[in-house]
């Protein structure tokens, strides 16, 4: 049997990983500017943490979760999304306590798991960057969080991203709209897909989220949820829109957008771009004012989003964005003969301790092969170290582009390599 990675997973090799690290680094820097701190939650949770919060009737719970019973007969699931685990942690660790400053702003970066048909930008193990903000019902929080995602895309150089916006209103507004959907869709029940016939009974808003052709036809002219917002919900949505306009962030209203999770209320949004003539959602989120209370905490407003790293990197690649990923070595040490092995080891460590990236030959190859490795590694400087250099206590440094050489003592290299390096590469 040939052992291979499971279907829907990937190995992220070092060249690609450098791009991942760059994107993650830009995200961390951006979130820090907005006063977000990192949180790390377990990769697996009790099944109920996800099923009850995400929604028992959602596709995530009914079709896509990796769940199992452990040896203690506990029902466990690999996390399919990031918000529910963070809310669980917020409540469990009593971050709602009065001594904790509000709002509490958290971000996470990590693996999520869903049993889906693998395709470009969508894997069974995928990586998500997400943020959650607890304790503010101010519409400015909605807008600031959306603006933070918009800011991140700008910093990464992504173009052609469109903000899709909608409001699900409060509980009363949703209840009124739920009944309106039932009244509208019930006469055409038989034309809906089997899944949407079930959704019509359990959670009619899920029908709007269907990707099936027959369902899209059925909901093409459904009533708009915006017509069912009460005064409070309308005021919140109006404030969000006016603040987005004040920040010059363009948006389109998408009244059929409901998001795939049941915990949302009021503002929901998606950032969508076009890839290979198909629309692709790269970031989505919204407000979830009842979720903390649902987990046993006090009534606490919340707002957040998640974005897929694989999709983000796919879009960067499709748009031809060159990420400023650092490549190459500062120094490559060519080692001539076994007698130079110990000296090369000491010199390599001394240069590394001064903050430089260094590699050396370990294979006892001929000098020509070592110089070829230095070129492959894009080394800026090559140090040649052999028996004669060791006897003299000096090494020859060569600029790997201009081929200019200089000779310096081992003591100088070990104590002030920064000055030597700067002189060599100037």
Swiss-Prot record:
The keyword Transcription regulation does not apply. Gene3D superfamilies: Anticodon-binding domain, Bira Bifunctional Protein, Domain 2. GO terms for molecular function: ATP binding; catalytic activity, acting on a protein; histidine-tRNA ligase activity; transferase activity. One of its GO terms (cellular component) is cytoplasm. Its EC number is 6.1.1.21. CDD domains: HisRS-like_core, HisRS_anticodon. It is found in: Cytoplasm. It is an enzyme of class 6 (ligase). It catalyses: tRNA(His) + L-histidine + ATP = L-histidyl-tRNA(His) + AMP + diphosphate + H(+). Its main location: cytoplasm. GO terms for biological process: histidyl-tRNA aminoacylation. InterPro entries: aa-tRNA-synth_II, aa-tRNA-synth_II/BPL/LPL, Anticodon-bd, Anticodon-bd_dom_sf, His-tRNA-ligase, HisRS-like_core, HisRS/HisZ, HisRS_anticodon. Keywords: Aminoacyl-tRNA synthetase, ATP-binding, Cytoplasm, Ligase, Nucleotide-binding, Protein biosynthesis. HAMAP family: His_tRNA_synth. Belongs to the class-II aminoacyl-tRNA synthetase family. Homodimer. This is Histidine--tRNA ligase. It comes from Streptococcus equi subsp. zooepidemicus (strain MGCS10565).
């Amino acid at each position: 049997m040939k052992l291979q990675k499971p279907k829907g997973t990937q190995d992220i090799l070092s060249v690609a990983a450098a791009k991942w690290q760059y994107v993650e680094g830009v995200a961390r820097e951006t979130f820090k500017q907005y006063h977000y701190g990192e949180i790390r939650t377990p990769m697996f949770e009790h099944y109920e943490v996800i099923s009850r919060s995400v929604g028992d009737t959602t596709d995530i719970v009914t079709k896509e979760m990796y769940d199992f019973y452990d040896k203690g007969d506990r029902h466990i699931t690999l996390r399919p999304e990031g918000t529910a685990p963070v809310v669980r942690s917020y409540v469990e660790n009593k971050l709602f306590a009065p001594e904790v400053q509000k709002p509490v702003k958290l971000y996470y970066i990590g693996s999520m798991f869903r049993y889906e048909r693998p395709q470009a930008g969508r894997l069974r193990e995928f990586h998500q960057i997400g943020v959650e903000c607890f304790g503010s019902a101010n519409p400015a929080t909605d807008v600031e969080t959306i603006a933070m995602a918009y800011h991140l895309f700008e910093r990464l150089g992504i173009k052609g991203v469109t903000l899709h916006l909608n409001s699900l209103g409060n509980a009363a507004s949703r209840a009124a709209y739920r009944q309106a959907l039932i009244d509208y869709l019930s006469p055409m029940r038989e034309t809906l897909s089997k899944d949407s016939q079930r959704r019509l009974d359990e959670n009619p808003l899920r029908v709007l989220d269907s990707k099936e052709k027959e369902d899209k036809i059925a909901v093409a002219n459904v009533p708009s949820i915006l017509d069912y917002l009460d005064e409070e919900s309308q005021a919140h949505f109006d404030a969000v829109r006016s603040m987005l306009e004040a920040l010059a962030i363009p948006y389109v209203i998408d009244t059929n957008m409901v998001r795939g999770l049941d915990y949302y209320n009021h503002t929901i949004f998606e950032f969508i771009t076009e890839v290979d003539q198909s629309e692709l959602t790269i970031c989505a989120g919204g407000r979830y004012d009842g979720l903390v209370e649902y987990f046993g905490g006090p009534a606490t407003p919340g707002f957040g989003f998640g974005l897929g790293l694989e999709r983000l990197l796919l879009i960067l690649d499709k748009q031809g964005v060159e990420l400023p990923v650092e490549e190459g070595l500062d120094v490559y040490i060519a080692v001539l003969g076994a007698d130079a092995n110990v000296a090369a080891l000491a010199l390599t460590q001394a240069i590394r301790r001064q903050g430089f990236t260094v590699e050396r030959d370990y294979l006892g190859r001929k000098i020509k092969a070592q110089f070829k490795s230095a070129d492959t590694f894009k080394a800026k400087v090559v140090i040649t170290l052999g028996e004669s250099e060791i006897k003299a206590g000096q090494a020859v440094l060569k600029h790997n582009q201009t081929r200019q050489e200089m000779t310096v003592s081992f003591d100088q290299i070990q104590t002030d390599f920064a000055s030597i390096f700067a002189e060599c590469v100037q």
